[in-house]
Amino acid sequence: MKELKIAALQIAPTGSLEGNLQKGLAACRNAKAMGAGIALFPEMWSNGYRIYNRPAQDWIQEAIPADGEFVEAFGRLAKELSMAIGITLLEEFESGPKNTLVLFDRHGRRVLQYSKVHTCDFDVEHALTPGDGFHTADLDTEIGTVRVGAMICYDREFPESARILMLQGAEIILVPNACPMEIN
């Protein structure tokens, strides 16, 4: 049986979009050097999951487009490294931002875009627009094609989330989660 190594990049954000971009690109390169086939960021890597004690408007203004330069830089890197990358962001959206994951395969192709369905009702996260459901996709990896799905943080508290993904054939469920510590 072939192994697929997944790097859970539980790293602390820098406090700026550009800083997070550079730190994230470096973390992916390090993950590849350590043999990872998939690199997965903690939720909302674009701005860092810093929601507490902040004015909602300040937080909402940090939202970026899911097809913008920040996200696309990780797609190019996925192709360069021949490694899948799950990049997360606070996504601009008309009715309010979304907590989103974009998954690129090892060829740099966007294969899955998923937004957190079960948003939290505390602090500024209540301003998030929930995603429209759980989805799976075929992910081309160095060990072959695997069916992947995703759920973000609080989604995992609902057993139905994983059940839906498993019924869609998910072999791997990626679960980005923000954690206030950095492990190197």
Residue ranges and their predicted role:
Residues 8, 41, 153:
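Generic enzyme active-site microenvironment
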Residues 19-28, 156-163:
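Short, acidic/polar
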